[in-house]
Amino acid sequence: ALVFYSFVTGISLVPEMVLSFIMSALLGLLISFLFGYLLGLLSIRFNQILGVLEFYDALLMLFGGSVLPISFFPEMLQKLIVLTPFYAMLSVPSSILSALLPAQYVLNQLCLQMFWVLLLALFISMYQKKLFKVMNYYGG
């Protein structure tokens, strides 16, 4: 698939870029999984979670670059958007593969993705422990 992509787009795929893309895509998937897990934990606590899910989807599409490219936003807002986990999930892997992200920023973005993974995992761990202490179980 990557060879076909390279042929169609004309972008030469160097091994470092492919490895960076694979790492970034896996980290993006992990961030997405952790958000899904967190939303699942929230559904245990709250009866009506649909509004939170809709809000999450809206943020993901807006700040992930699905609705509008990040470059369409004002420069000050762009600087904030690139720090969000939504950008780390969607835009970073595609920017690496399409060579839109300069090589000197790839490592920074991979580190930012790792930061989001660690932060979400830590928050989930703490929230889950607190949630399970107050949960009531019924049945056998």
Predicted features along the sequence, with ranges:
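Transmembrane alpha-helical segments that form the membrane-embedded catalytic/substrate-channel core
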Residues: 29-41, 62-67, 71, 122-131
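Transmembrane helix segments
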Residues: 39, 44-96
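Membrane-interface alpha-helices
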Residues: 94-106
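Alpha-helical transmembrane segments and their short interhelical loops
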Residues: 1-53, 107-115, 119-122
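Helix-loop junctions at the membrane-solvent interface of multi-pass transporters
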Residues: 6-8, 67, 97, 126
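Junction motif at the cytosolic side of a transmembrane helix
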Residues: 97, 114-140
